Amino acid sequence: MSSVFSRRNFLAGGAGLAASAFVRGVKAEEQTPDQMLNELIEENQDSSLDSGFDNASRNVKLPKKSLPTLSHSTAQTTEASVAQYEAIVAKGGWPEVSAVAEGARVGVKSAAVPALRQRLATAGDLELNSGAPDVFDSYVDAAVRRFQVRHGLRPDGIVRDATLRALNVPADMRLAQLKINAGRLKTLTENLGNRLVVANIPAAQIEAIENGVAVTRNTAVAGKPDRPSPDINSKIIQINFNPFWTVPVSIVRKDLIPKMQAEPDYLTKNHIRIYDAKNNEQPPSQIDWYSTEAVNYKFKQDAGNFNSLGSIRINFPSPYGVYMHDTPAKNLFGEDFRFASSGCMRVQNVRELVYWILQETPGWSREEIDEVIKSGERKDAKVAKPVPLHWVYVTAWATPDGVVQFRDDIYSCDGFGTQVNAVKG
């Protein structure tokens, strides 16, 4: 479909076809989940849409972009939401949604829709008596989108596999998640300053928070389940522009050696150089790749648009040797499952985050940052006032606007493993 949907039609029902429609001239399937969420929030909050479409779409309650995951208010409302979910569990929870509903979208009539409606209504995503019971109409579309937003899934209004799995996590497990995370949030929010950066690992999301407001929110790619991103409390002290990448020994052992065995010109193609203990460059042919000899050398990737760190690296002290950085593999930001790194955090639109970090550092205006990146020159910026940084593990939280959110327990820290996980890697 090539026509541009109006704002009104986007939420009024036509948005159920977002996978093939254009919204504001941008293909929905080319947008990241956060971009789609921002579109949806903006549509929902536009007061000019009050007339002419159904109440279910108009009243869809979505999280406010300005509310941070980590705040005293969030800790309090998460604690309060426990009672809400205790009441749901006491009444028997919610029904299981049949696999027949998978792929359901606007316009579908199915015997599986009544259970879907009941499930969405129980958690507050839908008014139960809205619309025909067995029809997936715009009421259900709006409710599915809200549910997807609350669970960190692409808000396209279609009941795909990940959405179906999230729908069928039992209410008592969601309650247990809330209880665990209410305690976590109480501890995490004890000593927050006015200006900080928070990376929520299970959400694969980074927020810059100033005076209790999330001023930027960046989609991230976090560590693989077998190479998890660690919990961190540190301070951002330096920004590297157009950085080199020194490959960690763990990656040399786990990745580079097997790649060189399979593809002998891998290092050359990826602009990675080898240096011995005296900093003399060595050719790849000098190393026995069928041994562990390679771990005794330093591997350094040249700066450039091919570099694994992209154009920016954000530095902070930590015992784990991790950092936040740009990436040339930007396609991963559009995935529901964004756990593909070796522990570092890859940051979408990292330049926006860096603008904010360097706001109080003289000599690093937006224009100056853009210019140095464009030049390709290696430069470092020392942050004038180091910014507190927290990498946290929060899988359930409720913001003061009353929206309860859940994420997969990707590293099994809650003790549920894959039982609460909707997205597969």
Regions from the language model: what does each represent?
Residues S3-F5, D172-M173:
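Short low-complexity, flexible loop/linker segments enriched in glycine and/or proline
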Residues S2-S3, N9-A28:
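N-terminal export signals
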Residues E29-L128, A132-R154, D161-G425:
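Well-ordered beta-sheet/strand-loop patches within structured domains
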